[in-house]
Amino acid sequence: MVKLHIGIDDTDSPKGMCTTYLGALLYREISKIAEPLDLPKLIRLNPNVPYKTRGNGAVAMSFDAREEDILKIKNLVLEMVKKLSEFSHQNTNPGVVFIEGDIPEKLERFAYKAIWEHLNITDAENIAEELNAEIHKFRLGRGIIGALAAIGHPLKVFTYELLAYRTREFWGTARKVNKESVFAVDHLTYPFTYDNVDLSKGSVLITPHGKDPVLVGIRGIDKNKVIWAFENITFEEPIDFFQIYKTNQNTDDHLRFKKIAELKPLDSAIVRGKVIKKYWEKGRHVFFEISDDTGKLRVAAFEPTKGFRKYVRMLIEGDEIIAAGGVKEFNGVLTLNLEKFYPIKLTEKITYEKPKCPKCKGTMKSKGEYLKCKKCGYKMKKVLIPKRIPRDLKRKIYEVPPDARKHLSRPLVLPMAENKILDVLKLKR
């Protein structure tokens, strides 16, 4: 028997299709002639790259196969990619990768680079040649980047997603899922399944909005709870089939600590800094600035984050925070698109008030360098009393709402969700 690893990416487009659908079909077919080593993998890559379709996800799967079946399996994969990829869209550039034997450790490092950085096709071709990986490019073949990364990702931390697919005649039509049943299931399975609904808006989150074949995607950390949730939701249209993926979704895979001067466009990062410019608003987006010992950075809570912006507005100059998110150019300025933040130290907020009249307790009013009582006319030298105003921010992590959350960002309700933020506190400054 031979270990055969298969990676696929960039088969979809905004018009339709889904790489997970193609991957699920292949996993079912190949499992008839080879032994799966695990569930298929869904690996989310750098969420900031400009040419992603939707979630920038690649798929991979591994089998024990007989030597005589290897060519048959490879041909099946290539034929299905040719048949089902969205070649009508100019930005669809599929890539397929085959690796036999053990997965090289170097490919694991490549996988994380594909999540943290912006890689190009040459980077993928070079590592493929070095590792003797078999690559197949369709058109530009950009998909080989994700295909290699999906094979190489070790999924040391992972979640599950159950994806149910629609019958073809329903593709492109409104999805029919009973809303009340989704809320009921969420109530019974949360937090072992999560991001099913947005309670603050009363909306369902498991149904995508595009023309792709996915009816629902149910995420969770307990595979059995995910299956139970699926079985207890009421669907008002037929389901073709479903597939469970192991995935790096909601693992914070994309976040690494960086100094501000080290940041580049398309990075995802955690930074630590002091607020040097209080918030301002433009087009319903909320901005502020922080600095560390290497430079300053604009930070943004964009309009889709809704109520999260309320907490951003509570920050004032002098506050020290840890902030996490994606880095991009916005109106020509390098900007951190905020996903979560943690106030480490809150500066004191002080106001100064006039004292009461010492004679009659009346209200004093300012008269140049003096205060004069409105009631009895008593005068005294102006002395204002400092008063500390309580800060509404707590020393805790604040995160964007579920419908604004990136695929890789870990909800605070999950185990280890605070680790990457709090680990920054352990670093020497």
From Swiss-Prot:
- Matching NCBIfam families, A to Z? tRNAmod_TiaS
Instruction: Give the Enzyme Commission number.
Output: 6.3.4.22
SUPFAM superfamilies reported for this sequence: Nucleic acid-binding proteins
Q: Identify the DNA-binding region of this protein by residue numbers.
A: 271-343
Q: Which key words are in the record?
A: ATP-binding, Cytoplasm, Ligase, Nucleotide-binding, tRNA processing
Q: Name one GO molecular function term.
A: ATP binding
UniProt record, GO biological process:
tRNA wobble cytosine modification
Please, which domain of life does this record's source organism belong to? Archaea
Kindly give the HAMAP family that the UniProt entry links to this protein: tRNA_Ile2_agm2C_synt
Give Gene Ontology CC terms: cytoplasm
Question: What job does this protein perform?
Answer: ATP-dependent agmatine transferase that catalyzes the formation of 2-agmatinylcytidine (agm2C) at the wobble position (C34) of tRNA(Ile2), converting the codon specificity from AUG to AUA.
* Stored InterPro entries: NA-bd_OB-fold, NA-bd_OB_tRNA, TiaS, TiaS-like_TCKD, TiaS_FLD, tRNA_Ile2__agm2C_synt, Zn_ribbon_TiaS
Family statement: Belongs to the TiaS family.
Protein name, UniProt field = tRNA(Ile2) 2-agmatinylcytidine synthetase TiaS
This chain's source organism reads Thermococcus sibiricus (strain DSM 12597 / MM 739)
Catalyses: cytidine(34) in tRNA(Ile2) + agmatine + ATP + H2O = 2-agmatinylcytidine(34) in tRNA(Ile2) + AMP + 2 phosphate + 2 H(+)
